[in-house]
């Protein structure tokens, strides 16, 4: 598995792209563990999310997993394409972002090399 260098990664297997707009998604590791997503529940636009706290969920043919916010902030947009076709989240996890956020607090996260090592141990 490879992880793009332009993102930071959480221990909850989510990525955050610190660019404009700031986007959040799941990692390839999470996508493989889930298999094929069949339902995605994302935070509402305008809602506040807190780093390390559940803010939605993704349901697959195998299981249901919480989406845990990698940063705190206000949700600016959700990816309607992923809501309409949840399989996008697991088919191409590094392209299929879930939501955009205005960050108010960004905890220390891992770069791609550190996350790759972390994922190999998981």
What would you call each of these model-derived segments?
Residues 59-68, 85-87:
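Short, Lys/Arg- and Gly-enriched loop/turn segments at beta-strand edges
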Residues 34-40, 61, 69-72:
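Short, solvent-exposed beta-edge and connector elements
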Residues 1-54, 87, 91-122:
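Acidic, low-complexity mobile loops and tails
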Residues 75-91:
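Short, charge-rich, low-complexity interaction segments located
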Residues 48, 66, 72-74:
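Beta-solenoid/beta-rich acyl/carboxylate-transfer cores
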